Amino acid sequence: MSKIKITFEKLKELNKSAMIPFITAGDPSPDDTVALMNTLVENGADMIELGIPFSDPMADGPVIQRASERALKNKVGIKDTIKLAKNFRETNKKTPLILMGYANPIEAIGVDNFISLIKEAQIDGVITVDYPPEESGEFVKRLNEEEIDSIFLLSPTTEDERIKLIAKQASGFLYYVSLKGVTGAANIDIEQVAENVKNIKKYSDLPVAVGFGVRDPKMAKAVSKISDGVVIGSRIVKEIEESDKVEIIPNVKKLMHSMKSAIDSSSA
């Protein structure tokens, strides 16, 4: 059983929602990435999404785009991202680790090579933003063979037939994008999200995590009440961007603590 599945099952028993923070590998520098990942875990992360820097991240808003740009300036690419994940795994064997990225860098190094590298780094799941389910069959099959979860995005505009198709391919969890725009966009309509999550669950037994637009503890708490996981990305990346170097770890720690307290309080 995958670490992702085990984590969600344990949290379900406790009536809790997973906190899933996102950071971009190599931002603000490669030397900071593993320390940041450890800080996330020490302050309540149930699993981590690690972004692969890419020059054209179409689903990402300005905050994460700039993080990608900074990482690329630091010469951090897909292989470096996997190496950083592997470094993290040297001291943390338990926390599920998910790579999030785009098809282009994966195809540039070759799918087989990518899967071989992430297996060696003990990656637990992959989100490939621009791999539609219709074209993902072989990729998903290869990941399944290595017991790596394939995580797909669903949006407010995803129709029921497509939800069914994605549900057949996906494993680990389903990632519901709460807004029609890019990451870090405007406010979430929590009632609409609740309705859509309920609809998704008609077609899949997988946990549903919600992301895009979770900007403060109040929103994190509201989202945790209606989902199995809360993805916090742009807000953390913004904290990294706006903090002086010596303040990054303390500020991320403080932010994580406030988000975790809010998420856990929803089950009280």
Residue ranges and their predicted role:
Residues 62-98, 141-155, 191-208, 251-268:
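Alpha-helix-loop-beta-strand connector modules within alpha/beta enzyme cores
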Residues 30-40, 158-168, 210, 214-230:
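Catalytic cores of alpha/beta
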Residues 19-23, 48-50, 97-101, 126-128, ...:
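Hydrophobic faces of well-ordered beta-strands that scaffold small-molecule active sites
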Residues 24-29, 100-108, 132-133, 154-158, ...:
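Glycine-rich beta-to-alpha transition loops that act as phosphate-gripper elements at the mouths
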